[in-house]
């Protein structure tokens, strides 16, 4: 009884989205496109999680910042074909931040931000914070890839501007709904 009252959304997120094992309709299509063939198992697992998150939360807009092969954004786009999504693949800090600012100003708010592998993750996070709303959520990749990023992730978790956070070891999830108690969860995902 206490679990239903205290943790319904978080419990559902963990049990029905993060730990979900059922094959989704788009997995086969994405595999045919070749995205699953060359990815290591853990990357495929993360991309499928990204698919399930977008499938559940249905953001109207998604911005991905980072350098990659396009597999993550392909999984997320497959979950919501009506979503306005853009990938900013800049290696140039100033140019990428300018593109991000322009896109955020165009959208007026950010529903979902995926901070993938980028050396200027802190600046991307701070820039996007001005555009969050209670339903906004961020996906932060590689939260343990360096000592500096680990330290920064701890700062994000402690930041009063964020609400609930999830540490999935390879990625971090940040939610901004202040109607819920600030809480940090460590989930054994990988």
Question: For each predicted feature, which ranges?
Answer:
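A short alpha-helical cap/connector motif
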Residues: 1-134, 144-190
């Amino acid at each position: 009884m206490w679990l239903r009252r205290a943790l319904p959304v978080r419990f559902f997120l963990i049990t029905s989205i993060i730990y979900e094992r059922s094959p989704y309709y788009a997995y086969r299509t994405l595999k045919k496109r070749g995205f699953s063939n060359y990815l290591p198992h853990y990357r495929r697992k993360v991309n499928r999680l990204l698919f399930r998150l977008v499938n559940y939360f249905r953001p109207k807009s998604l911005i991905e910042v980072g350098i990659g092969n396009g597999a993550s954004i392909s999984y997320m786009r497959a979950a919501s074909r009506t979503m306005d999504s853009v990938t900013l693949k800049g290696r140039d800090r100033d140019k990428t931040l300018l593109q991000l600012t322009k896109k955020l100003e165009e959208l007026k708010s950010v529903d979902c931000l995926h901070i993938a592998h980028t050396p200027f993750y802190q600046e991307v996070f701070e820039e996007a914070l001005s555009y969050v709303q209670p339903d906004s959520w961020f996906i932060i990749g590689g939260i343990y890839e360096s000592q500096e990023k680990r330290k920064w992730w701890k700062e994000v978790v402690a930041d009063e501007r964020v609400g609930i956070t999830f540490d999935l070891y390879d990625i971090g999830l940040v939610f901004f709904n202040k109607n819920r108690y600030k809480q940090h969860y460590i989930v054994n995902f990988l």
